Amino acid sequence: MIAENAPFWRRKTLEQLSQQEWESLCDGCGLCCLQKLEDEDDNSVYYTRIACKLLDLDTCQCSDYPNRFAHVPDCIQLTPGKADQFKWLPSTCGYRLVSEGKDLPAWHHLVCGDRQQVHEQRISQSGRMLSEHDVHEDDWEDHLIFRAS
């Protein structure tokens, strides 16, 4: 049994989280907003350093989060009901960690109280991304950074 004074992500199921609690699990790394390529042979997913046109390349925040689906119809919306599909998310992702019953890392803003730690610890790709406006889609393969685990 988990103590009542434990943080919400340790004592609640994903389905029990409020919208605010759910949104706060996002560490602000921006990795889910990077373009990904799928290997046709083995279905592996590879992250590129090519960012969605709405992603601020320094802050790793969406520049129009409330209206993102109007600008990017295939933008991914993470919800508790899709937790079984989170395997493509980085192993550091708060959504993935909590869905797997794991704790948040020490650098996560809900643990340390500092939203900049995700950048200072180089978890995010802040300053290392390119906008999709600047790279032709045929060249995305040249910008692979890691394979989803």
Swiss-Prot record:
<dbReference type="InterPro" id="IPR005358">
    <property type="entry name" value="Puta_zinc/iron-chelating_dom"/>
</dbReference>
<dbReference type="Pfam" id="PF03692">
    <property type="entry name" value="CxxCxxCC"/>
</dbReference>
<dbReference type="InterPro" id="IPR008228">
    <property type="entry name" value="UCP006173"/>
</dbReference>
<protein>
    <recommendedName>
        <fullName>UPF0260 protein Pput_1301</fullName>
    </recommendedName>
</protein>
<comment type="similarity">
    <text>Belongs to the UPF0260 family.</text>
</comment>
